[in-house]
């Protein structure tokens, strides 16, 4: 049997070897893995949750007509900084919770828990998002940098241990929303009304307690194996907390609205808004109760 000899190339150089099928498939597979990891990283950053950072624009929105272009830009930069800061926290929290999330019926499909995104990549991305958030804050004011740093410290403490303490975990989550509102006020140099901050804290605590209730109902006796704080929560105490935070949120919001300077017609619309706020919270609570 005679061997087939490849003809020499015209240039005198030996013919180039074509990549094998295995090598080609390996490269394609590697490219797909990188693409999946980047897509998973974007999902783990939870951009759909950035809507929560709209609370940064709450106080700037009240004085929209007097802000000017510079004030509007500062408010939007502050909001963007909190979007990055919150994504940084999500990535850190999911990295730390990846083992527990694998036992959760829903959270096991998260990119980090499912292995699509490596813990190393998630940690690096978390740090980069946090540093970028601080840099954006510096463009507005040093005080905004301090507030963003406080938010990152508070939420990192939550991820590292405070989430294991019942009721403290809810308070920390609610405090995060208060810091968002304060950040918006600082960005535009506005006063921070205590009544509004109280309403925001109570409203955020109300929503957080609702999530704890849903988790307790969904997981039952297994809830504490996923989140140690759930071993302390009881439906009766959560329901009492829901009633209390709902009342505080609506009353303080109503008092804040009444303290604003409105024309009579405007005051009526504001009170109507407070009533609508009550109904929204009520509808959420009814849904929780089934």
Where are these regions (language model features)?
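C-terminal membrane-associated helical module and adjoining short loops/tails
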Residues: 2-42, 160, 178-290
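Topogenic membrane-insertion module of multi-pass membrane proteins
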Residues: 2-102, 116-128
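Generic alpha-helical transmembrane segments of integral inner-membrane proteins
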Residues: 54, 58, 76, 80-87, ...
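Juxtamembrane "helix exit" motif at the C-terminal ends of alpha-helical transmembrane segments
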Residues: 62-67, 134-140, 251-263
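Short, aromatic-rich membrane-interface segments at the entry and exit
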Residues: 70-75, 142-148, 166-168, 191-197, ...
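Acidic (Asp/Glu-rich) catalytic motifs at the cytosolic membrane interface
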Residues: 85-113, 162, 168, 209-217, ...
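Multi-pass membrane catalytic core of lipid/isoprenoid biosynthesis enzymes
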Residues: 98, 103-148, 194-204, 240-252
